[in-house]
A protein has these predicted regions:
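Exposed beta-strand and adjacent loop surfaces of beta-rich binding modules
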Residues: 44, 171, 192-196, 241
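Catalytic-core segments of hydrolase enzymes
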Residues: 1-47, 109-112, 170-182
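Extracellular hydrolytic enzyme modules, especially secreted metalloproteases
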Residues: 4-12, 21, 101-132
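Noncatalytic accessory or regulatory domains flanking protease catalytic cores in secreted, cell-surface
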Residues: 67, 121, 198-255
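Secreted peptidase-domain scaffold signal
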Residues: 123-193, 201, 254
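Hydrophobic alpha-helical scaffolding
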Residues: 9, 24, 28, 68-77, ...
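Hydrolase catalytic cores
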Residues: 42-119
Length: 255
């Protein structure tokens, strides 16, 4: 549940990037959690090849040094490379020492973009296709703010943040991800520490994490008690002060 699970989409070389390939595993997990987390290019990808490699099945344009291949074995390195660049950016540009893995995961999901119909999250693409620019330097003057140092140590604890939106029409996206303890093998659900994401707009409307309809957050739903990733995504956020609150709904573990 703490790992980044990657599905694969086609690339422009042999098809449409919005096409999720048949060989990409689908969710959900047994307890209903959303998987995969993101998509990355996995169709007809060129990669370095070991000189001793004998497997050329399903490939074309193979040589002693390179191999063209299709599968999540190609998509996962693409996502891993994006994750490595996010970590390097946090350390070298943002000067954030030892960023947590959950923060890197959150930024991957923050920048992910829906493919095909507007229907995230879903069990084909999770939160969408990795887009490194959206994760680190979004267009149109939008900013990214992160926190991976705050601690919630007991049920009922909470942490709030406020953000001022000055231009109407801006998109507002909040991502909460945390590294959860391992649950019992026999547990029907795998979430141990249940955190909830709540976003309140200037008019007092509250959006709960992962409460989505037609690819965008909606009001009036229920808090998520399965996933250790929660997202709120709102198009055309209204001008004013928005409040993001992280609530420790059930501190079931030792940390």
């Amino acid at each position: 549940k703490n790992a980044v699970t990657v599905g694969m989409h086609q690339n422009r070389y042999q098809g449409a990037p919005d096409y999720i390939m048949q060989g990409s595993s689908r969710g959900p997990l047994d307890d209903g959690r959303i998987k995969p987390d993101v998509l990355a290019p996995g169709g007809y990808v060129w990669s370095c090849r070991a000189q001793e490699a004998a497997d050329t099945g399903g490939s074309s344009g193979s040589s002693q040094w390179y191999l063209e291949y299709t599968g999540t074995s190609m998509a996962t390195p693409n996502a891993a490379g994006a994750a490595a660049m996010i970590r390097e950016y946090l350390e070298e540009i943002a000067l954030r020492e030892s960023p947590q893995g959950a923060l890197v995961k959150a930024l991957l999901i923050l920048g992910a973009e829906d493919v095909g119909a507007r229907d995230i999250p879903n069990n084909d693409e999770g939160w969408g296709r990795v887009n490194l620019r959206n994760s680190l330097a979004p267009p149109d003057g939008q900013g990214v703010w992160v926190d991976d140092r705050s601690l919630l140590s007991a049920t009922g604890n909470s942490k709030s943040y406020t953000f001022d939106i000055d231009d109407s029409g801006d998109q507002f996206k909040a991502v909460l991800a945390w590294s959860d303890e391992a649950a019992s093998t026999w547990s029907s659900t795998q979430l141990v520490n249940n955190l909830n994401l709540e976003v309140t707009d200037p008019n007092g409307l509250t959006y709960l994490g992962n409460d989505f309809a037609n690819g965008r957050s909606t009001t009036g739903g229920n808090a998520d008690s399965l996933n250790n990733v929660e997202v709120v995504l709102i198009d055309s956020a209204i001008v004013g002060t928005w409040t993001v609150e992280i609530i420790d709904a059930n501190h079931g573990g030792s940390r």
